[in-house]
Amino acid sequence: MKVCIMCGGEGTRLRPLTFGRPKPCVPIVNKPSIQHLVSHLSNLGFNDVVITLGYMSDAIEKALGDGSLFGVNVTYVREKTKLGTAGSVKNAQKYLEEQPFLVVGGDHVVDLNLLEFYREHLNNDSITTIGLISIDDPTEYGIAEIDANYQIKRFKEKPSPGEIFSNLASTGMYVCNPEVFDHIPAGEKFDFARNLFPELMEKGYTLKAWLARGNWSDVGSPRSL
């Protein structure tokens, strides 16, 4: 199974920790966080790993190498300019277009059953399934409203306090059909939550939710460490 790990961000909210390293290399329990993530994915059977690179990419390559120490095969894809989340995955299209693939952020720290997530997508009729989790304060994340069939009816990226209509926050993890590449412009800055998902819903495509159970965090800000 294939997974695309997005590692191109500069981690500005984590400065000064990211002046000398990219976010995925911030240490957790004496190891770069990306090593914990790849080990978890490998244990679940995601052995074909595509990593999008931008800021301080050499450090990520040094942390993972060819992936053999973690039981995976790693392919690196570099961004020449900032492409956003969906744009960075589009840049790696040729490595991902054969089958549905998992997308995760390189700063994620999880013990979630992402294999269950992947299988749930294979069994539904959506172009993309979005991992959601219930949290107390969703203002730093995208939020979604779902119906009884787990179909996403509304999605809002980083709502202000007056715009909150749900406590189901996007984990930033998705399972996508290769068809999504038809809706992402090449070489342009384009985000999943801000651009792609609203456009797909406007065009009438079905987006489904998977409700995560377990521990999920990221190293995106100091309070998350």
Please report, for each region that a protein language model flagged, where it lies by residue.
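Catalytic-core segments of class I nucleotidyltransferases/pyrophosphorylases
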Residues: 46, 100-102, 109, 115-122, ...
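N-terminal glycine-rich phosphate-binding loop and ensuing alpha1 helix
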Residues: 1-58
